From Swiss-Prot:
EC number per UniProt: 6.3.4.4
Quaternary structure note: Homodimer.
Keywords, sorted A to Z: Cytoplasm, GTP-binding, Ligase, Magnesium, Metal-binding, Nucleotide-binding, Purine biosynthesis
CDD domains: AdSS
Organism from which the protein derives: Paraburkholderia phymatum (strain DSM 17167 / CIP 108236 / LMG 21445 / STM815) (Burkholderia phymatum)
Transmembrane portions of the chain: none
Claim: Hydrolase is one of the keywords in the record: no
Pathway, per record: Purine metabolism; AMP biosynthesis via de novo pathway; AMP from IMP: step 1/2
Predominant cellular place of this UniProt entry's protein: cytoplasm
Chain sites annotated for binding GTP: 22-28, 50-52, 323, 349-351, 431-433
PANTHER family in UniProt: ADENYLOSUCCINATE SYNTHETASE
Positions of substrate binding: 317-323
PROSITE patterns: ADENYLOSUCCIN_SYN_1, ADENYLOSUCCIN_SYN_2
Protein name: Adenylosuccinate synthetase
Amino acid sequence: MSASAVNVNPGRNVVVVGTQWGDEGKGKIVDWLTDHAQGVVRFQGGHNAGHTLIIGGKKTILRLIPSGIMRPGVACYIGNGVVLSPEALFKEIEELESAGIDVQKRLFISEATTLILPYHVAIDQAREARSGAGKIGTTGRGIGPAYEDKVARRGLRVQDLFEPKAFAERLRANLDFHNFVLTQYLGAPAVDYQQTLDMMLSYADRLKPMVTDVSRRLYDENHVGNNLLFEGAQGTLLDIDHGTYPFVTSSNCVAGAATAGAGIGPQKLDYILGITKAYCTRVGSGPFPSELYDADNANRQEEVGLTLAKVGKEFGSVTGRPRRTGWLDAAALRRAIQINGVSGLCITKLDVLDGLDEVKLCVGYTIDGKDADILPRGAYEVSRCEPVYETFGGWKESTVGIKEWNKLPANAQAYLTRVQEVAGVPIDMVSTGPDRDETILLRHPFKV
């Protein structure tokens, strides 16, 4: 084999994952890191999660399109592990292009990506309405039912749109099944076949220029030395397998999902960046050991938790739902680090803790009288966790916009140092505000 046949300088690949229940601030960090990446890849989830970016004081919320779209010249990929609503996609494209951002020439969609259809949305919403107090807290956007169809081999893919006759036949069979569930079990209206067929086929010509073999394209990009950034959605504790089941999302949110959801070999993942807030939040139902505040629970309304919610502007970027807040749970973080193989951490929203008299860190639990130093598996055991806290002095100085570690208040440094000790991996980045430039860099993920 000639030396020229072997690429001695392959591109590096970094995976960004949330280590909590989502909403960790991944979008800002992905955007920040794209100055060293030629491509950004979404590999799971759908338009149920919003990534909020603030660049030059202007706020942008992305739901499907990777955060790299805000950087000129960066290619963006939607992998086969995503479930795609064409309606939501084109709405997002139109919003971005109306702001002068070039999208369609830089966006590439896997032909194997599963489609979200109107009956998925109808089932999602009808189920949630029927569940009453037992609801999971779904966004009602059809994500779960689309993944169900994928696993049941009923799913329709992007590539199926280009075979209209076969698409029509499979759609009819799917609607026979789903309309029976909607009308006979959920007591909801049926979804119209012809209207659905016409709508979905109308997207085919618009989608086709963006559809490609994403897996092959990523391989080729690496081979010529280009760096890729893999952008996770939601968070580890919402993972369908590793989260607080059944209060989870419908996809794998962990770093390993990048391999299956984008079609890249696991040995190609060079660095895993775990994103965690300096405190914790959760949206919807499910156990939350270090919880301080829940607007819907009169027994969980501590003043400091409300302060975190107000200062941190803790409302879902897509749903607008208020988030539950609590102290940073390092025992849960330890679980996420182990599952993801985290190389280093990025702590976000440190500035939200400014002005507190004291800051607490959950370092473990007691469960039925026994000590535990890591989050257990499944919702029922997690719901029995009583947090064990360490308390730190707060700081009155503002950390907003600080870009150097040694300029942080001493108590903030002490708190973060302890988080690093308990987590067992280095803190490589700290976010001190919502803007792209309000960031402390200790080690660059693409240069480690």
